[in-house]
Design a protein with these regions (language model features):
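Hydrophobic residues positioned within well-ordered beta-strands of beta-sheet architectures
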Residues: 37, 51, 66-68, 94-96, ...
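Solvent-exposed strand-loop boundary residues in beta-sheet-rich modules
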Residues: 74-76, 116-118
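N-terminal prepro-regions of secreted/extracellular proteins
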Residues: 1-45
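Short, aromatic- and glycine-rich surface loops/edge beta-strands on solvent-exposed regions
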Residues: 104-117
Length: 134
């Protein structure tokens, strides 16, 4: 049943995200464990930053974990405003919202790790960054 809801949610999620600012990364042959990664950050009314990371592993049985941070650049360095973690088998979609202040550059900083199964052997890990000014 969970997979049915994922399949129903994916087209809707993609349509919404296409209207926002995103960065897509497709797998190379030597990018073990990953098939596709999308990361995005957009700003809504009243300063709501909507940010997300989606990981599609190269096999649907693989488990992926996303560690995602929203950071603001000020004083010459990046400051973490909020962070969280989400893990799932097959497609892993993790989105958050956080209110921010205008006049800064923000970034989504996500580390994605792919495992053979939940609690299983690590296959690969990579970091993805997307910046946007508000």
């Amino acid at each position: 049943m969970k997979n049915f809801y994922k399949l129903l949610f994916i087209p809707i999620f993609c349509l919404v995200m296409l209207s926002n600012t995103t960065s897509t990364v497709s797998a190379a042959n030597n990018w073990a464990g990953f098939q596709h990664v999308t990361i995005g950050l957009s700003f809504k009314k009243w300063g709501l930053a909507s940010f997300y990371t989606t990981v599609i592993p190269s096999k649907s049985s693989y488990y992926s974990k996303i560690n995602m941070k929203l950071q603001r650049y000020s004083g010459g360095k990046w400051h973490t405003l909020t962070s969280g973690t989400n893990g799932d088998t097959s497609i892993n979609m993790y989105s958050r919202g956080y209110y921010v202040t205008k006049g800064y550059t923000y970034r989504v900083y996500s580390t994605a790790t792919v495992y053979k199964s939940k609690g299983g052997k690590k296959i690969n890990s990579d970091t993805f960054i997307y910046k946007n000014k508000y």
